[in-house]
Amino acid sequence: MNRSKIEKVLNNTTEKDLLYIFIPSYNRPRFFIGRNLLPMFTDRALSKVYIVVREEQYKEYKKENRDLIKRGMNLIPIPKGTVTGVGSTRQFIMDYAIENRLPYIMDMDDDIRYLQFLYRGKTNSGKECSKHTGAKDYKIDPLIPQKVLQLTGKIAREVFRKHPEVLLGNIRKQRFSNPSENSNIRYQINKGPTPRQTKILNMKGIKRAGIRMPDAFNLHGDDIGFAAEVLQNGYSCFNIPCLCYDYVDEKNNSVVRDPHNPDKNRHLHKLEYDGLMQMEIKDYLRESFKFPDGQYMFGDIDWRAYHKLHGTRYYIKHWKTKRK
């Protein structure tokens, strides 16, 4: 889809299309998305944003984010002793959503730096590709990040309504070069990247299925661990390729891994791997990165292996385009 068409689609969204957006944060009261993206949101949009922090850090977060809170952003304290890691924090968010009867939510990391859309373009060599907007575009339209999330919500509701077996999704991680097909796809099911960092959750379906975050991923691997739980229970994941995000380099910004303690990091990655090896995903896990000695570092869903195992196929929904 060309730029003018996707911009028209984005401009036809409103704050009503936003999902409830939960952003867990720990030890970072001046978290990146709160410093750089949320101030560009409208007050009405901010009222659908929930920052989730531990009770002992609540006052500091409230002080650092008082301007956004005055404009409508919500700050939720997690009672002391309720969570002990990232996995239990994600579960707290899901429990909160269920308790408050929120049908669909986003669970987004606090270090997201850009929210962009893709459009049809060409490389310097003339090859067709999907280009993405950048920070310079925010100067022309500062509501781009909000509109991206509005369209995310609009598409997500469509997916969950038409495909109730889908419980989890996300938008795509920004790449330097994007396949030309991406800007033409509205959404795809059981294909594409593992849902991470900008997760979209069908809480109605998750409650009905009784799915919870596995305890094995409390300290590390919560994203892929939860996706594995969804899939092994017979449910599906989706992705929105025409929308993308970028984040702050985790090597310098992680609250879990310590760049100065490689042994601790190895232990965390091994915990993730050992947990995944106890699940069905062991049969369709692609080991994306390894330490120099070959130990597992990061993994993703191998959709080809998944479909071969289950005898299924992916599904792609394209944008409707008028024929000439």
What do these predicted ranges mean?
Residues 1-6, 10-11, 17-19, 27-31, ...:
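C-terminal catalytic/acceptor-binding lobe
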Residues 2-10, 23-44, 57-65:
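Short, well-formed alpha-helical segments that are part of the catalytic scaffolds
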Residues 17-23, 38, 48-51:
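Hydrophobic targeting segments
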Residues 31, 59-60, 113-117, 177-180, ...:
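Short catalytic/ligand-binding loop motif for oxyanion handling, primarily in non-cytosolic enzymes
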Residues 49-53, 237-239:
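Short hydrophobic alpha-helical runs that function as membrane-insertion/retention elements
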Residues 53-106, 113-131:
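Active-site-proximal specificity loops/subdomain of glycosyltransferases
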Residues 104-108, 167-172, 237-241:
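A structural signal for short, well-ordered beta-strand segments and their strand-loop junctions
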Residues 113-224, 232:
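Conserved catalytic core of nucleotide-sugar-dependent glycosyltransferases
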